[in-house]
Design a protein with these regions (language model features):
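Boundary/linker segments flanking structured domains
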Residues: 1-40, 45-128
Length: 128
């Protein structure tokens, strides 16, 4: 059973470096999405995106995304729940998040009810 409800206030970016500039030191969850906004991979940055993608790493992601129209979505979260939010999102969408290797086989020990606000990515379930 979820023990806490949290609304994620999503922000959309066309480059990882833009997202990093907006959330340099704030704990956040980020989504790498396709050009239609469909979530493909979830990540957490418990110390902000500057620490997670410092220096040339952000630019390397921008270069890899160049011409694809792929998107990055970021939602600030309290650092105390950053890992739990990432785990919950991966668990709920484990069938389609093939780029997330951890968290797809066992439900998180700390369960959260997540709601999505702002400019949210599209979270889709796999066709059954």
């Amino acid at each position: 059973m979820p023990t806490q409800t949290l609304t994620l206030d999503w922000h959309k970016f066309h480059k990882m470096t833009e997202a990093r500039a907006a959330f340099p030191r704030h704990a956040c969850i980020y989504v790498q999405a396709d050009s239609q906004g469909r979530a493909k991979r979830i990540g957490k940055a418990s110390k902000g995106l500057e620490a997670r993608y410092r220096g040339g790493t952000g630019y390397a992601l921008d270069a890899a995304m160049d011409g694809s129209a792929n998107l990055v979505f970021v939602a600030p979260v309290p650092a105390s729940v950053c890992a739990a939010v990432e785990e919950e999102l991966i668990w709920w969408h484990r069938e389609v998040f093939v780029y997330n290797n951890v968290g797809r086989k066992q439900a998180p020990s700390r369960r959260l009810e997540l709601r999505h606000g702002g400019d949210a990515p599209r979270f889709e379930k796999a066709a059954v």
